[in-house]
Amino acid sequence: MTIGRRTFLSGAATGVGLLVLAGCTPPRPTPTRSVTKAPVPTPSTTAVPTPSAFVRSAWGTDPFALGSTSYLPVGATPEHRDDLAQNVLDRVFFAGEATDSSEPGTLQGAWNSGVRAAGEIAAVAGDGERIAIVGAGLAGAIAARRLVDAGYDVTLVEARERTGGRIATTQPDGWTVAVDSGAWALAGAGPALRESVLDAGVGTTPIDLAAIRSVAPDGSVLDVGTTGADALTRALEWGAEQSEDVPLAEAFAGSGAADPAEAEAGSGDGEPERVAAFLAGGAALTTGAAPAELSSWYGLGDASAATTAQELDDDSERADAVLTDGLAPLVASLLEDVEVSLRAVVSGIGYDEEGASVRLATGESFSADRVLVTVPIGVLKTDAIVFDPPLPFAHRTAIAAIGSGVVETLWLRFDESFWDADADAVSAVRWSLVGSEAGITEWVNLQPVTGETVLIGLVGADQALSLQALSDDELLTVAVTALEPFAVVPG
């Protein structure tokens, strides 16, 4: 089996880039995952100027997200996604990327699930029935569009003050580019989704997310070759041969491959460091989970499907990735003429063979013939929405099994570039630090694509969790320090 870097980099725009909807939930409970707060370097005179503006995401602590994407930890299988996608008594239906076993963790997966759920509802609903949809992300929006067009009475409730969920577009004062702190690029999208993006008037620009500029802590450019891909392939093959599923971290150790657990922060280039950088720019951004959490069998696809890994790699090399000028209009266009209630936090859903009801945190409730639930897996795992009666065992098992990963972005705008702006130097929009102790090691340079001096820092899994508790000033110090190896030294 061959796992190429490009396999994961089509998802590097997806780990946070191709996220899905946010739903409705009361205040966030204490998270079960904890990671030590990232160290903040001592500020020093640096060739990297202070950004003139920044926008940071906080999906891991967002009360209506509780994570960025779903993943399969040890013991979970794609069948758990299929189980969660099943309806209950033809009254309660589920959608969202976590329910899509073909394209989980992506906009396409969210789209697929919304289309599927709308079709399932239409197959059993009578003419003009009232359908309640919980969550105004992409899955909820496309389902609402399909059901309204089919003549159903659709009411969509969303906890936020806006639609879109983890499609979150803003354009703050002073920014000439749209800032998507959630889904920021489109990769691997099917024809229907791409057509809807264009129909919504969303501008797109091709962006090559496969080419990477790998740099050592001293600023020297590295040729990392296939070290990371080869080690991951070896680990997955070893894991697939075991009698039971083991964490990906254990598969690295057991296979004899270069082990990212042996990487030493700040040590510079080395095989373990190359593998760690490969995972930081790939698996961590597509799953939001660390090797110690990911299933070696299913965490990165089906490890037993030795003939499909190269096919995945080839598919990811298609020049289909595009940077958009903001994805929010996509959701807005889908919800045109749909009845949407914002700031409506759902606290309970009741159902029986006769119908369903939706209870809001305000104490109000309303009835519907059927309910479509599109909240993220992180929200479902909190039991914040109480189902009465409780969901069937298969659904509860699936919710417990599927993980909620964390991926964050940090958008930085500079008055001028401090990096080498020569054509050869900026040909790769992806930057990766190898063997660095920096808190943010993966970056996207938008200057070659947009002409604007904007960088996006990407962090996933434990790296993302370690930055959550930092203040804005602390995070900026971490970011500026991390970017020093990319700065041009005067003279």
Show which residues each predicted segment covers.
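FAD-dinucleotide binding site
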Residues: T2-G491
